[in-house]
From Swiss-Prot:
The lineage of its organism: Bacteria, Bacillati, Actinomycetota, Actinomycetes, Kitasatosporales. This is Ribonuclease 3. Its cofactor is Mg(2+). Its EC number is 3.1.26.3. Homodimer. HAMAP family: RNase_III (MF_00104). GO terms for biological process: mRNA processing; regulation of gene expression; RNA processing; rRNA processing; tRNA processing. The active site is at D74, E146. GO terms for cellular component: cytosol. It catalyses: Endonucleolytic cleavage to 5'-phosphomonoester.
Amino acid sequence: MRGTVSVPKKAEDAKADPPAKKKADTQASSHTLLEGRLGYQLESALLVRALTHRSYAYENGGLPTNERLEFLGDSVLGLVVTDTLYRTHPDLPEGQLAKLRAAVVNSRALAEVGRGLELGSFIRLGRGEEGTGGRDKASILADTLEAVIGAVYLDQGLDAASELVHRLFDPLIEKSSNLGAGLDWKTSLQELTATEGLGVPEYLVTETGPDHEKTFTAAARVGGVSYGTGTGRSKKEAEQQAAESAWRSIRAAADERAKATADAVDADPDEASASA
């Protein structure tokens, strides 16, 4: 009679430990890290979908992408930010509220929040996007962040999604109120330089690095004078940073002049009245 040798179940498991299991363990650990940063534990399949870019889906047999969740998250984000601005600025007209919202809900701002979460390292990307620096592309980071917000809404409800949006975006909401035009730094700078009679800003941009990993440096100049510089992974990002730097520099100088004038009036009001 031929005997059979039975292999203990645990030994079988150890012997047949596939790379897929190791990959699943790594993914679970990665998701735990992201969930810790978000402050919420989500249903696993939902989080996976939120992190699945269409390039990965197409290269892997047409898996579900994060685009529907992105659509949902965009609406949740817009609602929470709009509600906050409406309550925070009771005297602002609709047009100005819309500009403030646009300063918060845009690809550049969302990408910066995504970078703060190191979201790029968790995204499932196709090989093509991976090879062209997709993990740091503003559009991909912004879309994925909206998808994650959508996933939190579906899994945890509106209160949880609202809390997450406030935690991630309240600093930007506060910052948006300090923008001159309330839309973006380039618009703000142009309005400020017009008010101060300085002329129209121009941007000188240089680039360094290989094609797939370029770094852009921009200088914001007004009337031939450089007021600020900025760097970024895109020309637009570098120009925005340069515009912000220039805006703050020109605004500070204008505030100093206004303060000096006010001090002079306080010191000798009669002379100030005569001059007027």
